[in-house]
Amino acid sequence: MTNILYKYKGIFIYNNKMPNIDIQIKEFNKINYHVVEKNLLEDKNNKDYAFKVPISSKLTLEFSGKDNANVIVNTLRRVVYDNIPTYAFPVDLIKISDNNTIYNNDYMRLRLSQVPILNTDLDIYSLDPIYWINVDYSDPKRPKHSSEKQIEIAINVYNDTNFNKNITTNDIHYYEDGVELQKFNKECPLLIIQLRPAETFKCTMRAVLGVGERDNIWASAANAYYDDFTTDNMKEGFIDNPNNKINFTVESQGQYDEYILLIKACNYIVKKLDDIGNDLNKRFASKEIKESADLIIVLDGEDHTMGQLLNYFLQNHPDVMCSGLSKPDHLVNSVQIRISCADDIKSPIKPIFEQINLIKETYLHIEKILNKLNNKHKEKPNSRMKTKR
């Protein structure tokens, strides 16, 4: 396979070498969503004090290999938090029509915006900023993605008893494209509100597509973290990790299986690198960025997620003497990368595109392994994966 790196001075520059990526991934642990019964008493046969607890899904993968690095895993971690599109209920689309409880409407809108949307198929891995940056979700004329479904919840409850009454997800009506569905586990419902006698609560809420960068209610991962095994917490010192082993754990918010989530993250990263490469190609061709042994490249619209990834790979290129990243304003998504070449190299233009290509190949390699691991789970008879790509 031959890859076009960039077009410079009217000439296409090709990369004929296919990088041999030394990264291995194996499944360390996979927990699917399930329910367990617990008891406050030692006597488990006494069901008066028994209760059921939901256990969230969780996936732990072991990354290793000569080419593995913290920044590779950390980029996946940041992307699953901030960049994968999901559905959520923004407070603008939670309309409370009747509420005489002790909980005011602002509190309830904030609480209801945290209600998760579970097992909802979505065939996209990125969402154009026109659909979420500075968008007024209450505006019926707002731009909508063609894949966006109509997801609504209606709640209309009244406590006609003499006791406090818990209102849970068992008491709501959930609709997807006009069809009422049962999305929540009836054994372990989520608490919505508690009503005292003669209290009423009535509302409707509508979900929209967004990303975690706008608000964490759209984060596709509830938790994502890694252990790089380079520190000894007991001795408070550093230890060797010759095979660059990293255990990466992801807990889904519930819309996607963890494997699907990570595959989408790889697709997103490759797309972003394509966008960055195309933008740089235009700026080099138009002389906006002039050829020099010492370059400063500004990546508007990017933060440390893609900036630090590119900076790390540039630092590892043999023709780059040094590369550094800065974010001048932490409230503005724009990063600067300063690159200096080795003495015998006139410009870092070619190394930049070589490393963009190498990063793309790295995440395509990771995606390929994730697909294989995902397919193994699909083949298991007790697999509980419900989300498709």
Task: Pin down the residues of each PLM region.
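Protein-protein interaction/assembly regions in multi-subunit complexes
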Residues: 2-389
